Amino acid sequence: MKYLPLYPILARYPFLRIASRVFSFNIEDELRKFLDTVEAAKRIVDKAIDGRVEYDRFTDESEFFCLGCEENCYDCQKRGTLEGCDLCMGCFENCSLYYPREAVERFYTNAKLSLLTYIASRMIVSAMEDWVRMRYAVNEASYYSRLLREDVEESGKEPIVRLVAIDLGAKLKGWKMHVSTFVRVSARIKDDKWRLVNRKLRNGWVETTKAEVLRGLEELLRMKLFEKVPVSEAVSEAVRELSRKAKRESEKFAMDLGEVDLNCLPPCMREILSELQRGMNIPHTARFAITSFLLNIGMTVDEIIALFKSAPDFDDEKTRYQVEHIAGERGKGAEYTSPSCDTMRTYSNCVADCRVSHPLIYYKKCKSKS
């Protein structure tokens, strides 16, 4: 049957662009016809607002048929690995693999429902505030990354990684990452081990591990899922309902800096706070920097935890532990000093040349003049 091997893949990974080749329908009509998909999308976004992931999806646990196919055809032998694939999907158009009609219909339906749910959820968050869309992007990228990890580590479906990589514009050679892809990913992760200067580079390819490739794809997917898409009237009621909840939630983490003089914050700290307020997923180095800095200038643990409630991956218990540790209320009892300007530059958290050696010096100088 035409495109049969792709149905289980699209049921698990509906964000793939190949869906537009496999399915052709009016999205508005289909969403109104399959109302369950809009409800499923609502649950996904609702949990994203709460910082949780919805695991109850329209998925399919079937194998990628080409990997074990016994058909003696060129496409299965050469294209089943997706090596060199350009996403034309022409090699799957004439699939002659036989499955009972009921099974084929199930594969098709699961893929279609998964795709409609994905589309509806993208539409809903596209009509909402940036912080909701960011939480959604972080949660969904993490969810699909977990599926991909399961497919690779438990089922040996490595061709699926190649398909996802091609779809996201990532260049891979085995488990090596092309330098252009590595730079795109590392610009957002901002972890010391993701700095190009710390990696082995040969003929344009960066030595990376399987885990790093999967982490890189997760980051690229997060960037894709954060983009806005056109919104259909079919999800308007869901948007109104969830927008009310998002408004209530955002009021909980409205930024209150207490006695802190916002005008005297150094540019680097203002930038980190701005990203937090927009619901951005800031790197660990930036989280440590802003936490230690705000503690150093007099903010309380509870006040700082309240700031982090807008983070897409906020976890109250984990955040409290980390903030209390930096404050010296756990561990050895020593309060940490915020990083110097040199350290901020090292981790790409510096955004301006303030002609000082430490963010605290900037703040104290400004306060003394006010």
Swiss-Prot record:
Sites where the protein binds [4Fe-4S] cluster: C268, C341, C350, C354
Q: GO molecular-function annotation terms?
A: 4 iron, 4 sulfur cluster binding; DNA-directed RNA polymerase activity; metal ion binding
State the family named in the UniProt similarity comment for this chain: Belongs to the eukaryotic-type primase large subunit family.
- Organism whose genome encodes this protein: Archaeoglobus fulgidus (strain ATCC 49558 / DSM 4304 / JCM 9628 / NBRC 100126 / VC-16)
Q: What is the lineage of its organism?
A: Archaea, Methanobacteriati, Methanobacteriota, Archaeoglobi, Archaeoglobales
Subunit description:
Heterodimer of a small subunit (PriS) and a large subunit (PriL).
Q: Name one GO cellular component term.
A: primosome complex
Top-level taxon in the UniProt lineage = Archaea
Q: How is the cofactor bound?
A: Binds 1 [4Fe-4S] cluster.
Its GO biological process annotations read: DNA replication initiation; DNA replication, synthesis of primer
Pfam families cross-referenced by the UniProt entry = DNA_primase_lrg
Record keywords, A-Z = 4Fe-4S, DNA replication, Iron, Iron-sulfur, Metal-binding, Primosome
This molecule's function is given as: Regulatory subunit of DNA primase, an RNA polymerase that catalyzes the synthesis of short RNA molecules used as primers for DNA polymerase during DNA replication. Stabilizes and modulates the activity of the small subunit, increasing the rate of DNA synthesis, and conferring RNA synthesis capability. The DNA polymerase activity may enable DNA primase to also catalyze primer extension after primer synthesis. May also play a role in DNA repair.
What is the name listed in the Swiss-Prot or TrEMBL entry for this protein? DNA primase large subunit PriL
